[in-house]
Amino acid sequence: MADKITDEYAVGIDPEIYANNPAYSSLFNPYIHKQTIIADHVSVQCHIDLNGIDAVGSKFGNLNAHAGNFTSLCAPNCLPERFALVAYTVEYAFLHDALNQSGMTSVSTRVSDKAQRKSEVQAKIAAEYLRLDPVFGEWFLNKWQTFTACVKDVRSLEFPSLDDYLEFRIVDAAADWTLYNFRWGSGITLTPEEEKIADPMSYVAYAELCLVNDLFSWDKEYASHIKSNGDVPLVNAVHIVAVTQGLTHCAAKAVVQAEVRAHEERFCQLKEQYEATDKPSHEVLRWLRLLEHSMAGNWVWSLCVPRYCKVDRNPYKDHLEKYGSDAVRVLTPLDRLCWPKQEIKDMKQSELKDPSSSTYKSHFSPLEPNPGPEQMRLTISQTQQQRPVLNPYTYINSLPSKNVRQTLIAALNSWYKVPVKSLLIIEGAVNFLHNSSLLLDDIQDGSFLRRGRPVAHQIFGVGQTINTATYLMNEALYLIQMLSPSAVSVYTEIDEMRNLQLGQGRDLYWSYHTHVPTPAQYISMVDGKTGGLFRLISRLMRSEATKNSDLDISQFATLLGRHFQIRDDYQNLQSEDYTKNKGFCDDLDEGKLSFPIILSMQSPGFSNTALSSVFKGSQKGQTLSLEMKQYMLEEITARGAFSETKAVLRKLHTELLRLLIETEKKAGGVENWALRLLIMKLDIAEEKKVAPPKSDSHWGVNQRRAWKGCQKNGRPIDKACFLRAMEETLQK
């Protein structure tokens, strides 16, 4: 079975690079990707995107002029369509140590140019994973959050033994995160059962990778530790062995080298045992092959790499000089970013203008959205006189939020380059307006929960909450008057503020009178109520722009509002997360005629008598029973309304991507990855259960599994016995 595992894209590297080097003693032969030039290109591209062209090569990652690119060596069978993204991400991870840790989806308007570049690179990576594979992308980004949190915790710990250290190091060094990325890139998919079978072998390989990394990076890390007078901690296997076993660093390095060989030997033994089982999985064998490639690739790459030792020439600067800045930009050119292509090609503009048409029906595999980044807000200076008025605002402002509007402001600033002072004013005004609308919405809708917490008016009273909401509108105007006259006219003379109130009024009228609007009427209401604030944001920023002041994104903002509101309607009735935050189908309690309900009540061949009666009852303040809500969900489902709603969302999602590409071209080709990520995160998916990231305790279990077993003579062994047996073999 193992003989059938082929290397489609991998080729062996020249043995002269490593065969005669005494520092290379791996049991495995190294390979490299046939298209390694792509990995080199995107590695340089990542430097340009992150720090600008003048800073290319100021830090070191993938590139190695001696042996080849790290990603090319460790994932030599990576699929061509995923290769560039995988290599770009690994390059960013290499550079990450020199940056402040944060999640892949962090976006802020109040940052330096350097930090803004970092946010844009993170957004590019996140958006591309979500575009290519929503389920894996969701897992992958969550795993990154685990990694960045772990780095802060682990580096302050002490470890009683090397095994305790390795249990943590796998997470600290992002070994599993990196190898899962390589696995996805190589098109390898394991079932949960196959994952469990492979885990002990995976652990041994991950530990070997960490040990080899520690061996080759030791001299550099120790020098940094001494130079900093101990401020830079020593998180390295050599140091752990020296401390726990009372050895010199030289002797500790020899012990670590023996550990590396022991882990490779154990990997081979476990692999042989698995291959001898009945019907070994082809995917598991492909995974084991990838692990072998990664162990060999990491080792040969480490022999002479700028990250660990001085080199005569800078491979990044040499590559840029040879190929130029245009050639290295191979990751997702503009004409490839809209997905899926065929759907866009076949789409008619008339279909997009009327999302209620039957042509909106389609099948797709969308993505469940992540939580948004932490919002940075402009707050009102609270005098003693203001404090009672602001209590409801302070409360609702403190609740968790997806921060879509904050993210939109940060994303649009990539084009408009609004001065910092004006940007903060716009951000603050929008925050006041948004929270004002939330306070009023909760009262008008009769809501009980907001983001999983009691609504403000239940705590502070209806009268006080209404007063706060109207006060916030005045405060928003007060802020906007600090901007240019054109910005003030956007707020006072253009109809967006009127549209917000008129849209909300129509929504309340329909619910109170149980009047079922047409889908087109509903979307018209959404264009005012939700799209109005998005358009207001874009127009305020455009009025203060120092660049692209003629760039009008009103159509994009309108469609974004439609997508946002219809998605919210769908999630309220279908999402487990919404149930946690707002209660189970609370739109039904409120008697709200949301988009899926409107579609269901206009389905031909069905009587609406029962549904109408339920909605009239809810207007009398009756909270619907669980059984009644389940009945209504069954009715809506049977009429195909949820499927049709998803089809509408799919069309809107695709058109938003098309408009984004069109706008990027109008903005001089400036790619807006933060905006692209926002669109991807607002896409909707089935609530699939994705395996949670594996913790260090998980790898502790697999550490014990890896070293428990039988030698060929049938005697039970553990790691210590295995090391002794290997030493005896070498002595013979």
UniProtKB/Swiss-Prot annotation:
- Pathway annotation: Secondary metabolite biosynthesis; terpenoid biosynthesis
Tell me, which GO biological process terms does this entry list?
conidiogenone biosynthetic process
Tell whether Lyase is among the UniProt keywords. yes
Positions annotated to bind isopentenyl diphosphate: K402, R405, H434, R451
* Binding site residues for Mg(2+) 2: D97
**Family from the record:** In the N-terminal section; belongs to the terpene synthase family. In the C-terminal section; belongs to the FPP/GGPP synthase family.
UniProt-recorded name of the protein: Conidiogenone synthase
